[in-house]
Amino acid sequence: MPIHSSVLELIGQTPIVKAQRLDTGVCELYLKLESANPGGSIKDRIGLSMIEAAEKRGDLKPGATLVEGTAGNTGLGLALVAQQKGYKLILVVPDKMSREKIFNLKAMGAEVRLTRSDVAKGHPEYYQDLAKTIAEQTPGAYFINQFGNPDNPAAHEFGTGPEILEQMGGDLDAIVFGCGSSGTMTGLSRACLLYTSDAADE
């Protein structure tokens, strides 16, 4: 087994296992274990994708501050990547987030700012809107903006999707996934569409 120079090299290429003790009827059910990512979820993929794409474009300079609003695991993925790459990270999270998750974010080096969870998008204290404001008011800051960032679905279009298709040998009828920012849905849909188009051409 190889020795890796960075934990970021462990993101992706997660295993697939066949469900054995579940009643799946006439179907065969396979589970892709995204919990095997170093940060514990599929969000490691988009954290790496969004930060590295910004680096390649020149949007991120050494020592920059990253800012994002998150109510879920994206914060953990970003904290993992930011810590490894030496960026300061400010995360704006709703006050309903679990204490355990907040402790984890802080332990990984993120600055956590709590905001109200009882307001909707468009309100200045809504976590996404507040994160954008903080980014605009912080010199040298870069707003990740997972909900409008094309590098979010790209992580799945060029990463997760091709992995699944390769591991399954293209033999699958449906994919079931959770949906938040819609990055997983968009990226996997594009990957599957490209695969079926290529298969039809053959």
What label would you give each PLM region?
Residues 1-197:
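PLP-dependent amino-acid enzyme catalytic core
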Residues 198-202:
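A short, hydrophobic C-terminal helix/tail in secreted or cell-surface proteins
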